[in-house]
Amino acid sequence: ADDRNPLEEFRENNYEEFL
């Protein structure tokens, strides 16, 4: 994740929830 890409970081932090 990157501070310039909050959506990408959100996806990484919530990957299991998205499954």
From Swiss-Prot:
Annotated organism of origin: Deinagkistrodon acutus (Hundred-pace snake)
UniProt superkingdom: Eukaryota
Post-translational modification: Contains 2 disulfide bonds. N-glycosylated.
Protein name, as recorded: L-amino-acid oxidase ACTX-8
Enzyme class: oxidoreductase
Keyword Lyase: no
Catalytic activity, EC: 1.4.3.2
Cysteine disulfide links: none
Family: Belongs to the flavin monoamine oxidase family. FIG1 subfamily.
Entry GO CC: extracellular region
Record's keyword terms, sorted: Antibiotic, Antimicrobial, Apoptosis, Cytolysis, Disulfide bond, FAD, Flavoprotein, Glycoprotein, Hemolysis, Hemostasis impairing toxin, Oxidoreductase, Secreted, Toxin
Assembly behavior: Homodimer; non-covalently linked.
Compartmental location: Secreted
GO BP annotations, alphabetical order: apoptotic process; defense response to bacterium; killing of cells of another organism
GO function terms (MF aspect): L-amino-acid oxidase activity; toxin activity
Tissue expression profile of the protein: Expressed by the venom gland.
Names of the cofactor(s): FAD
Record field: catalytic activity: an L-alpha-amino acid + O2 + H2O = a 2-oxocarboxylate + H2O2 + NH4(+)
Role description: Catalyzes an oxidative deamination of predominantly hydrophobic and aromatic L-amino acids, thus producing hydrogen peroxide that may contribute to the diverse toxic effects of this enzyme. Exhibits diverse biological activities, such as hemorrhage, hemolysis, edema, apoptosis of vascular endothelial cells or tumor cell lines, antibacterial and antiparasitic activities, as well as regulation of platelet aggregation. Its effect on platelets is controversial, since it either induces aggregation or inhibits agonist-induced aggregation.
